[in-house]
Every structure is written in C-alpha cells, then in structure tokens.
Curated annotation (Swiss-Prot):
Protein's name in the database: UPF0179 protein PAE0681
Matches recorded under Pfam families: UPF0179 (PF03684)
InterPro entries: UPF0179
Region spans: Disordered: 142-167
Amino acid sequence: MRRVVTLVSKEQAEVGHRFRVFSIPEECKDCRLYPVCMGRLAPGRSYKVVEVRPSMGQRCKITDGEMVPVVVEEAPVIGLLPLNKALEGVVVTFEEECAGCEGCPSDVVKKGEKIKVVKIVGRKRCRGREFAIVEFYVVSPPSPSGSSISATSQGPSRAPPSRRLLK
C-alpha cells in the first residue's frame, strides 16, 4: 500500500507500531512542521511504522516532545460490507448499508468513498441482513456529485495511468 514519510513522537518511532489518527488538532495546522507531519495523514485512518529514519531534533509544538521521521503505510480498515459486495480484490463504493450495526466503519469511511476489499475475515448478521467482515483500504474520496452508484471494475481501467490502482 501507499507509503508516506511523516513525523511521530520518539515513543512511537518503532517498526511495527500501529496508530490511528482520530483528528488533527487546530494547533498543528499553524506549525511549520505540519506539511511533513500531520498534513500527510488522513483522519480516521490507521497506520503502521515500517521504517524509522534518523532524528533531526524537531520538536512538537503541542507536546514539546522529540519528533522522529518515519515511513508509514496505511493499515487496512476492518468493517462490514453486504455479502454481494464482499469479494477480495474488488473496488466498490461504500454506501453505509451497515449503519447502526456494531463494526460498521462509518466513523472511518464516508458514504461514496471507493474502497478496495483485500480480505474477507468472517460474517455477521445485523438488522436482519447478512454482512461480511472485511479488511479494506480507502482508495478514493467520495465523488463530488454525491453519486451513489456502486461500481466494480470488470474490464481495463479507463483512468489515466497515474490514477490506476497498483496491485
């Protein structure tokens, strides 16, 4: 998956450490380190540290703690999808069909976002419907038109090469 260089606290700078960004504090947005720190991460997403780089002595404006450059990759989200959309490798539009069910990832994924299912890990029944418990990645933001068309790729991508998903 996509790798990004960002800054984390010295305590978090350990290969294998996982963390989730719940929100970005307002104080961060005025910091000179924001573009290489929180500015590279998305709220609601989980990340895993895959490489630690040498510290350059940067300090956090909020905690005054030492910040260390690391390479992170987005960790998959675990959530519910209707059984008819739960196929490994498929890209679908998240429609919040599981709203109100425990395990529904609506706090992490917005209606209309494209997600790529990477693994099916189980099944769950909620509100009279069957859902698959899946691991997935968010691959694109919701379309500006607010379209709720569910799409799966059945043929070659028409997207320009720079916008195609990499396997």
